[in-house]
Amino acid sequence: MEKSKVAASTKANNLAGYIAGAIRENGVAELKAVGGGALNQAVKAIATAREILAPSGIDLATVLAFLADIKMNGEARTAITLTIYAR
């Protein structure tokens, strides 16, 4: 499964819909966030997706991991991957 890139400008509700759909279809969703704003949107989306899936009896668990330093616009940045599982 390909990691969905999250930006600070990503709408959390739209991302929550993506997460809920991926969980229903595959049981897992993967996100990649670079920067605090992007991580904030990802966390809000996971919380919203949990609310969307709760009536179906699906709960979520998330595993976080650092990616190696990546280059963005010539600067070294640290990315965080968020792997969301149904439980």
Q: What spans do the regions from the language model cover?
A:
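Short beta->alpha linker loops
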Residues: T10, V34-G37
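C-terminal edge-of-domain segments
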Residues: A54-R87
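Short, hydrophobic/π-rich interface segment
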Residues: G36-L64
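Conserved mixed alpha/beta catalytic, RNA-binding, or beta-rich assembly cores of soluble enzyme
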Residues: E2-V28, A42, I46, R50, ...
